[in-house]
């Protein structure tokens, strides 16, 4: 007995097994055929060899483990019919994928195989075991497979061959006898088969093959356009989803930024309010502690005479510039420091002129005024603008 599996079926099975998150199982669909080989030697001795070949065309995976049996290994026939439906007669075996295990059938798998052989009515039912092994450092991964045909005494291992997979010589390249199950192909053959096939199925004219080829190409183009349109729709939907996700992320970021800015402004406002209140309370306490600074000192003649350093008669009031005090108060009230300085300088000059005036009058009224008149007086101008007697 030998077995063969098509290349695309084997690659699909390996891809599904390698990308599965856990162990999984399913059924193998195909057919069993007999091959008769005649060998003739130089001595005209013929030899006939009969070989039973199991051809695996496709696989039908189950949704999860224990989908058609329980933990004790009892097969549920209703679940089995629901999975296989009308493909029950095409089942030639079943498979199981395990990770990091030995390539041997377990006791539960042997019980399941016996029940499936009885329920499906397939005496040549086979079991394909696929194992996935990786090294400790996960640098090397190996996918191993073995095909069993359980007997009464032991589990017989059957050689599994894959057409078009082997050496690159021309002899190894051959076409597998896999039936075509495409509905479009069957429809085209049914429409154009009468033109170039006889009743016995023999081809009439080779030129009609091009018509069939063109018809098949049109069908393929139509299907390709439909697939392309569906892919475009999926691509546009995916782009729209990505755009919406980007907008959501941007709005979330803007909202967080606004909240952070509002919080920082609130903190700055609170700090400024506290600082202003602290400064106001400090100024009020300082002003209360120095009440003499609140009102200017009263003007007295003794203070003016002591400042000038010259005795003046008591009946002479201190002359003031017209509007100087009022102007000074107004400027202080308006908060103009430069104007205050100007008024103060004008008042100082006025006081100095009045002081000179007092000195000259005092000399004129003194008893020695005659002698003073006889002696010449020289006035010199000092750098500060005051008049001094020499």
Swiss-Prot record:
Q: Which residues form the MPN domain?
A: 3-149
Where does it primarily localize? cytoplasm
One Gene Ontology term of the molecular function aspect = polyubiquitin modification-dependent protein binding
Q: Which key words are in the record?
A: Cell cycle, Cell division, Coiled coil, Cytoplasm, Cytoskeleton, Microtubule, Mitosis, Nucleus, Ubl conjugation pathway
Q: Where in the cell is it found?
A: Cytoplasm; Nucleus; Cytoplasm, Cytoskeleton, Spindle pole; Cytoplasm, Cytoskeleton
Q: Name one Pfam family in it.
A: MPN_2A_DUB_like
Q: Name the GO terms of the biological process aspect.
A: attachment of spindle microtubules to kinetochore; cell division; chromosome segregation; mitotic cell cycle; mitotic spindle assembly; protein K63-linked deubiquitination; response to ischemia
Coiled-coil ranges from the UniProt annotation = 209-248
Q: Which domain of life is it from?
A: Eukaryota
Q: Where is the composition biased (Polar residues)?
A: 377-390
Location of region: Disordered: 288-390
- Biased-composition ranges, Basic and acidic residues, are 355-365
UniProt entry tagged with the keyword Cell division: yes
An annotated GO cellular component: cytoplasm
User: Which PANTHER family does this one have?
Assistant: ABRAXAS FAMILY MEMBER (PTHR31728), BRISC COMPLEX SUBUNIT ABRAXAS 2 (PTHR31728:SF1)
UniProt function note: Component of the BRISC complex, a multiprotein complex that specifically cleaves 'Lys-63'-linked polyubiquitin, leaving the last ubiquitin chain attached to its substrates. May act as a central scaffold protein that assembles the various components of the BRISC complex and retains them in the cytoplasm. Plays a role in regulating the onset of apoptosis via its role in modulating 'Lys-63'-linked ubiquitination of target proteins. Required for normal mitotic spindle assembly and microtubule attachment to kinetochores via its role in deubiquitinating numa1.
Give the family from UniProt.
Answer: Belongs to the FAM175 family. Abro1 subfamily.
Q: How does it assemble?
A: Component of the BRISC complex, at least composed of ABRAXAS2 and the catalytic subunit brcc3/brcc36. Interacts with brcc3/brcc36; the interaction is direct. The BRISC complex binds monoubiquitin and polyubiquitin.
Q: Report what the protein is called.
A: BRISC complex subunit Abraxas 2
The species is: Xenopus tropicalis (Western clawed frog)
């Amino acid at each position: 007995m030998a077995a063969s599996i098509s290349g695309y079926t084997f690659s699909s099975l390996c891809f599904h097994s390698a990308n599965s998150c856990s162990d999984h199982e399913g059924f193998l669909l195909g057919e069993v055929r007999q091959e008769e080989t005649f060998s003739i030697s130089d001595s005209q001795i013929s030899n006939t060899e009969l070989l039973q070949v199991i051809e695996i065309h496709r696989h039908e995976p189950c949704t999860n483990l224990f989908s058609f049996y329980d933990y004790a290994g009892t097969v549920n026939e209703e679940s089995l019919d629901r999975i296989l439906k009308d493909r029950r007669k095409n089942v030639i075996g079943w498979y199981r994928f395990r990770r990091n295990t030995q390539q041997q059938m377990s006791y539960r798998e042997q019980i399941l195989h016996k029940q499936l052989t009885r329920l499906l009515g397939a005496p040549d039912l086979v079991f394909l075991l696929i194992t996935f092994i990786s090294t400790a450092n996960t640098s090397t991964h190996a996918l191993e497979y073995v095909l069993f045909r359980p007997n009464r005494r032991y589990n017989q291992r059957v050689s599994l061959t894959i057409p078009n997979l082997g050496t690159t010589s021309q002899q190894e390249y051959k076409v597998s006898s896999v039936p075509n199950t495409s509905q479009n192909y069957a429809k085209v053959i049914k429409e154009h088969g009468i033109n170039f096939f006889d009743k016995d199925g023999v081809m009439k004219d080779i030129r009609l093959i091009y018509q069939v080829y063109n018809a098949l190409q049109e069908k393929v183009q139509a299907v390709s356009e439909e697939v392309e349109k569906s892919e475009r729709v999926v691509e546009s939907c995916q782009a729209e989803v990505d755009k919406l996700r980007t907008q959501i992320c941007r709005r979330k970021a803007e909202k967080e930024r606004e909240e952070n800015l509002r919080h920082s402004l609130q903190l700055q406002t609170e700090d400024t309010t506290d600082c202003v209140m602290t400064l106001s309370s400090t100024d009020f306490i300082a002003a209360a502690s120095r009440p003499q600074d609140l009102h200017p000192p009263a003007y007295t003649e003794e203070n003016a005479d002591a400042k000038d350093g010259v005795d003046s008669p008591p009946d002479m009031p201190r002359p003031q510039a017209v509007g100087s005090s009022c102007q000074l108060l107004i400027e202080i009230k308006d908060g103009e420091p430069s104007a205050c300085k100007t008024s103060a300088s004008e008042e100082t000059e006025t006081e100095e002129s009045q002081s000179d005036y007092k000195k000259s009058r005092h000399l004129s009224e003194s008893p020695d005024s005659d002698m003073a008149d006889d002696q010449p007086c020289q006035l010199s101008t000092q750098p500060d603008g005051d008049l001094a007697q020499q």
